[in-house]
Design a protein with these regions (language model features):
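Structural recognition of the conserved hydrophobic beta-strand(s) that form the central parallel beta-sheet
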Residues: 120-123, 147-153
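Secondary-structure boundary motif
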Residues: 110-113, 142, 189
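Catalytic P-loop NTPase motifs of RecA-like helicase/translocase cores
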Residues: 128-129, 143, 158-159
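Clamp-loader machinery-focused feature within the broader ASCE/P-loop NTPase space
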Residues: 1-131, 300
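Charged, glycine-rich active-site and insertion segments that engage polyanionic ligands
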Residues: 1-49, 57, 69, 146-147, ...
Length: 341
């Protein structure tokens, strides 16, 4: 009865679809798990199915008025709350603003425009401060009829327990490489795509379907991945002068990412991925290596990395992510990290 195009997460999908069929849709949901596991994709399919009026047939039908409005981002009863750009800095604000939650509360209290559910989705729920969290808690504690709020976060520990307790928590897990491979092979419209590339992307995704799909849809992203890994090996063998030169190359390579730190975090993802593979090779677990296209380089350079050094670099990357969230200059963050490689 459903038409959801999702890779993996079968238990979560069954749970949500059952809630729709049995008229047990909750007021609050928390989708939690690392990026690229399909949290936002599942949320969209869930919302689309709740709103769909194209009966009989699978939901969402994609053709009824509600489906068309939602697909085009025009449904008046669906609200997306995201961090906004700070006019002074030109960068995303550190937190979701209290005024945004107050505005959401006002909208949810109004009558529905299309005699449907009123739905709010907050894709970066980890960016609540104390005031916004308290304001949202009041909405969750006193939900209006036929209202659904979906929070999405990479880590439930970043949310107040009071918020978590008011939501049905659904934990998204990594997806098997074979399942991702099969999903990619079933996609249409990608010329020159074959089984060997699907296998490579499935391995590179490390259980994250969204990462594999992004590589497939965006060739530039794949080129950046290749550049990031090559730069990593280059940096580990370079002197300080060469390292600073490479920093400039990385900044130039990611020059379009000065406002959105997402791509710099992708750089860190790629470095963590190769470090994980070095650990696997050093531990004689070669079949588990994700970056199979860099296996020769991994094997050649593995002795440059002790287990302690790998752990130290991983800790440094996590610290760098924290600095980026605090809006510290990207170049300074990279310099601090790379000097200690």
């Amino acid at each position: 009865q459903f038409n959801w195009h999702i890779c993996g997460q079968e238990k979560i999908i069954d749970f949500l679809q059952s809630a729709i069929l049995n008229d047990r849709v909750a007021h609050g949901y928390l989708f939690v798990g690392p990026a690229n596991l399909g949290k936002y994709a599942v949320a969209k399919e869930f919302i689309g199915s709740i709103l769909c009026q194209g009966q009989p047939g699978p939901m969402p039908c994609g053709e009824c008025f509600h489906c068309r409005q939602f697909k085009n981002g025009l449904h008046p009863d669906v609200y997306i709350v995201e961090r906004i750009i700070d006019d002074k800095t030109g960068k995303l604000k550190k937190d979701i603003a209290i005024d945004q939650i107050r505005d959401l509360k006002s909208r949810l209290q109004q009558a529905t425009f299309l005699n449907s559910y009123k739905i709010a989705i907050i894709p970066e729920a980890q960016y609540f401060n104390k005031n916004t969290a308290n304001a949202l808690l009041k909405i969750l504690e006193e939900p209006t009829n036929k209202t659904v709020i979906i929070l999405i976060a990479d880590d439930a520990n970043k949310l107040p327990q009071t918020i978590i307790s008011r939501c049905q928590v659904l934990k998204f897990l990594p997806v098997a490489a074979k399942k991702i491979n099969d999903y990619l092979m079933g996609l249409d419209g990608f010329s020159g795509f074959d089984g060997s590339e699907a296998k490579l992307l499935a391995r590179l995704s490390q259980g994250k379907p969204g990462r594999a799909i992004s590589f497939l849809q965006n060739r530039q992203l794949k080129e950046k991945y290749l550049g990031d890994i090559n730069n990593f090996f280059k940096l580990t063998k370079a002197d300080f002068s060469a390292r600073f030169k490479t920093i400039e190359e990385i900044i130039d390579w990611h020059k379009d990412d000065t406002v959105n730190i997402k791509q710099i975090n992708n750089l860190f993802d790629n470095w963590q991925s190769i470090l994980r593979d070095i650990l696997l090779v050093k531990s004689e677990n070669e079949p588990l290596v994700a970056n199979i296209n860099f296996f020769e380089a991994i094997n050649k350079n593995k002795e440059l990395f002790s287990f302690n050094k790998i752990q130290a670099i991983l800790a440094g990357i996590n610290q760098a992510r924290t600095y980026l969230k605090q809006n510290i200059n990207t170049k300074s963050v990279l310099e601090n990290l790379i000097i200690n490689l």
